Amino acid sequence: MKTEKSTYILGIESSCDDTSAAVFCNDVVLSNIVATQQVHKEYGGVVPELASRAHQQHIVPVVDQALKKANISKKDLSAIAFTRGPGLMGSLLVGSSFAKSLSLALGIPLIEVNHMQAHLLVHFIKEKNKKVPDFPFLGVTISGGHTQIVNVKDYFEMDVIGETLDDAIGEAFDKCGKMLNLPYPAGPEIDKLSKLGNPQKFEFAKPKVKGLNFSFSGLKTSVLYFLQKQTKEHQNFIEEH
């Protein structure tokens, strides 16, 4: 139910291959609509140009659905928040252009959001029986493009104390999954198969990294060379293992 004190914010996310829109009333999520792009499956990874085109097709219906599910109209909005980055340039441009145009047309404030900060602060969204963390707390962001350990001191004060020095873990999962002929995205499939396998069966080199940093490129290369060697000796090695 709408009240005079209610603040409605439309959030728009388009940093990679999902077009998302959500409506918040104060700090409660009223709707969250996501359009996933299936076009990338045949390529085994996100193709930036195709992602941008798909965002252009999805952005209007996704926002319309988010508003409809929240049972409000554009005129009820108090502000619009959008992902400023990091992400794919073409994808970000679609979301930012739409958000800026809509805020200008409605005459309401525009809020730029760093989506890595948003990952860390998502715990503050109100949910039933859910406890929010106290500051400071340690956060870990693991996505297709980032792997970080962050000391979160306050809403806008954060220090990265560890990060990947090369590939993000999500990228390593997808690349290894492609080598294994797994469907994209490979992460869920690798996670499922790992529970059925023998962790002692094969051994791969472990990265030597100082401090709290990570490195996944060596693992990716190790898997590549291992599979090349095994499939050369046994053509059906992947299918049999």
Model-inferred region functions:
Residues 82-106, 125-126:
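Short Gly/Thr/Asp-enriched flexible loops that form oxyanion-binding sites at enzyme active sites
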Residues 22-23, 92-93, 122-125, 150-154, ...:
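Short acidic, glycine/serine/threonine-rich loops at helix termini
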Residues 100-120, 164-168:
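Short, acidic/small-residue loops that bind anionic groups at enzyme active sites
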Residues 6-86, 115, 239-240:
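N-terminal beta-alpha supersecondary unit
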Residues 1-5, 113-137:
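Conserved phosphate-binding catalytic cores of ATP/NTP-utilizing and phosphoryl-transfer enzymes
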Residues 2-8, 15, 32, 133-135, ...:
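A short helix-loop
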Residues 44-51, 82-89, 160-164, 207-212:
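A short glycine/serine-rich beta->alpha loop
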